[in-house]
């Protein structure tokens, strides 16, 4: 099963929080101390909390649940997309549009528009338009792809959110809370852990740390999905005799 060790976390700089003056007192239970006016996160708390989160994510995968990876700041954006694609899941890595979850009906209409444009671009419809009209549609398609490309095949609300930077993505977390969707989030020393079901106390800025969280989460979801496949195969008698 996907797990992360303290050594992995130390190497990735998970323990480095924000400057002490920016701290959120609600993160006090997860802080080890301070060095050079920077809070140090207690990895003895983070390691078991993250591994518990990974075990739960694997269960989501096993039930064929949908995980939405969210991280829109520069340090996380590309890694969020890669993790979602690697685990056959979904992502928002550009900008969280208000109502993406709570007003999913409207979002679904925009996704339909995006898919219509994609079909038109493929079947030659764009070529029959005037240059100006084709350019306008192409631009709108690109804009929609940037915002909704990572969720266009989600086909409904997700079963879990995996968030990088609880502070930056507080709107996404609030929407998930309103709908009862479990939230797994990396929470740094400057963030509010309220509303996060599975808190992962850790650095949310260092690219190596961000990649560590995302790679482990993607692996956990994939392992869960594959476990389900193995169980089905066993039931169907595909298991070879020793």
From Swiss-Prot:
One of its GO terms (biological process) is translation. Belongs to the universal ribosomal protein uS2 family. The gene is rpsB. This is Small ribosomal subunit protein uS2. GO terms for molecular function: structural constituent of ribosome. GO terms for cellular component: cytosolic small ribosomal subunit. InterPro entries: Ribosomal_uS2 (IPR001865), Ribosomal_uS2_bac/mit/plastid (IPR005706), Ribosomal_uS2_CS (IPR018130), Ribosomal_uS2_flav_dom_sf (IPR023591). PANTHER family: 30S RIBOSOMAL PROTEIN S2 PROKARYOTIC AND ORGANELLAR, SMALL RIBOSOMAL SUBUNIT PROTEIN US2M.
């Amino acid at each position: 099963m996907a797990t992360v060790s303290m050594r992995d976390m130390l190497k990735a700089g998970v323990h480095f929080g924000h400057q002490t003056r920016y701290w959120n007192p609600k993160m006090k239970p997860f802080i080890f101390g301070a060095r050079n006016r920077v809070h140090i996160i207690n990895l003895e708390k983070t390691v078991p909390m993250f591994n518990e989160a990974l075990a739960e994510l694997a269960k989501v995968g096993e039930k064929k649940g949908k995980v939405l990876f969210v991280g829109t700041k520069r340090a996380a954006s590309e890694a969020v997309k890669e993790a979602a694609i690697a685990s056959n899941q979904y992502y928002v890595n550009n900008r969280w549009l208000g109502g993406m979850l709570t007003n999913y009906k409207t979002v679904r209409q925009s996704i339909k528009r995006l898919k219509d444009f994609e079909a038109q671009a493929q079947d030659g419809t764009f070529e029959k338009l005037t240059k100006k009209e084709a350019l306008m549609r192409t631009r709108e398609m690109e804009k929609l792809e940037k915002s909704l490309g990572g969720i266009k095949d989600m086909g409904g609300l997700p079963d879990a959110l995996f968030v990088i930077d609880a502070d930056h993505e507080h709107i996404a977390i609030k929407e998930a809370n309103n709908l009862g969707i479990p939230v797994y989030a990396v929470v740094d020393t400057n963030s509010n852990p309220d509303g996060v079901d599975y808190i992962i106390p850790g650095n949310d800025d260092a690219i190596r740390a961000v990649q560590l969280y995302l790679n482990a989460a993607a692996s956990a979801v994939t392992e869960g999905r594959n476990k389900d496949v193995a169980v089905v195969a066993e039931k169907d008698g595909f298991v070879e005799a020793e």
